Amino acid sequence: MRMIDIIEKKRDGKSLTKEEIEFFVNGYTHGEVPDYQASSLAMAIFFQDMNDEERAALTMSMVNSGEKIDLSDINGIKVDKHSTGGVGDTTTLVLAPLVAAVGVPVAKMSGRGLGHTGGTIDKLESVKGFNVEISEKDFIKLVNDNQVAVIGQSGNLTPADKKLYALRDVTGTVNSIPLIASSIMSKKIAAGADAIVLDVKTGSGAFMKTLDDAEALAHAMVRIGNNVGRNTMAIISDMSQPLGNAIGNALELKEAIATLKGNGPKDLTELVLTLGSQMVVLAEQATSLDEARQMLIDAIKTGKALNKFKTFLSNQGGDDSIVDSPEKLPSAKYQVEFKAKKDGYITEIIANEIGVASMMLGAGRQTKEDVIDLGVGIVLNKKVGEHVEKGENILTIHTNTKEIDDILYKLDNSITIESKGEAPTLIHKIITE
């Protein structure tokens, strides 16, 4: 088999066989296929697309390129949730203990964040002593004992994807549905999930800005999952404005605690209940979405979900007293109010710009080496569709420096007030095939 033949075949719009895809992935992973041929094939895929069989073969070749996490010793159906990312996306922090409280095993592998705010691990590390560097054996035991644990991304999972991702980044082939879908799904499958719930974001703060693109990606990932024997479904949710009210690590953790107590923002609570219901049904802990939703609402009302979160924190060395005393979490020196310049309705809060402002405060990383300031960030007091009066506080900036003119300027250009406005739809579609 020759790489040039595979490139020409795809360039001409023909379908590649499983063997041809495996030949490319194995060769590229081991350095036998040079970057220039890999980038040529990536560009051919970008223009000619791939059918469902090719996408599944590419995904599984990437899964098989490295180590796989074996979660078979964990009792029950392991359901993993993946979000395509956004601003103020606190869902994992609420969802993991919530679904665990009704018997869904959550064996979560999480990373650190690059960009607007930290990843799930950065947020959890706002809790003094919390440790994700645990052995696979301890990880499995924690999930069997308490239904929920989080481990740092470890081992050599999907090396082919890491290599191909870096190449796509510099060759103009990032925005290709088959390449994005296989990249995301290979990581989830290698991490040992039996079933997968996807939260595909759309809007200004999302990777997929339009609903059509988000839908195409959701269908692609769901089909890959179902084709390789993993029950998969997707929800398309709005990210035109930040999710919830908090953007920043400790601030988002405080918001997660409030949500587990039943006092969280409406949109975050609704998204968590929607995603959680799907997870509970896929884990076969309920027979209908309505039954699953009621189980989750009860777990919040009775305090079961909150207790699960406490045990989860203390099991991994974290100080669980922060659940009852969130003021113990890292906080910023100064709080600066950002006030409305006129009366009206908020029609726009550009999610990614708010995210960038939060990163400028120190809540996120621009490079891998950056140190995150866990206490800083932004808390929205108003959301799109809500009425404000001139001089009313729209958001509060939590900062450790008074030099924030550039951030105020950015916020000024990210929020629009007009004479009428309405709240965006939170959940656009549910995709099961």
Curated annotation (Swiss-Prot):
One function term, GO molecular function aspect: deoxyuridine phosphorylase activity
Entry binding sites for K(+): 88, 90, 243, 246, 255
Cofactors: K(+)
Sequence positions that bind phosphate: 81-83, 92, 108-110, 120
EC number: 2.4.2.2
Subunit structure, interactors included: Homodimer.
Reaction(s) catalysed (UniProt annotation): uridine + phosphate = alpha-D-ribose 1-phosphate + uracil; thymidine + phosphate = 2-deoxy-alpha-D-ribose 1-phosphate + thymine; 2'-deoxyuridine + phosphate = 2-deoxy-alpha-D-ribose 1-phosphate + uracil
Main EC class the enzyme belongs to: transferase
Free-text remark on how the cofactor is bound: Binds 1 K(+) ion per subunit.
Function (record text): Catalyzes phosphorolysis of the pyrimidine nucleosides uridine, thymidine and 2'-deoxyuridine with the formation of the corresponding pyrimidine base and ribose-1-phosphate.
Name of the protein in its database record: Pyrimidine-nucleoside phosphorylase
Family, as annotated: Belongs to the thymidine/pyrimidine-nucleoside phosphorylase family.
One Pfam family from the record: PYNP_C
InterPro entries to which the protein is assigned, alphabetical: Glycosyl_Trfase_fam3, Glycosyl_Trfase_fam3_N_dom, Glycosyl_Trfase_fam3_N_dom_sf, Nuc_phospho_transferase, PYNP-like_C_sf, PYNP_C, Pyrmidine_PPas_bac/euk, Pyrmidine_PPase_CS
A GO CC annotation given for this chain: cytosol
Binding residue positions for substrate: 168, 187
GO BP annotations, alphabetical order: pyrimidine nucleobase metabolic process; pyrimidine nucleoside metabolic process
Domain of life: Bacteria
